[in-house]
Amino acid sequence: MELPTRIRIDTQSVESRTIVEVESEDRLGLLHRISNVLTRHDLNIHVARISTEKGAAIDTFYVRTKSGGKPTDENKLDELKRELETELG
């Protein structure tokens, strides 16, 4: 059974970081692909919670910009979401 990829970006729950949550079918190289997209968007991962169960991956990343700020630009975050969906789709 194929699990659809879902991306959720939350700028409200944590004051100093943006949360990027990825739900997807678990597969070889998934974390590598996600981290490459985050890097291309000049984001640093400060905390990652990685969970897999029965072929599903739920990976949550708390990110900041390379300059240490909280990513909040909606256009850039929409672009990040689209690229993650394309990369993992």
Predicted regions and their residues:
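A conserved regulatory-domain signal marking ACT and ACT-like small-molecule sensing domains
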Residues: M1-G89
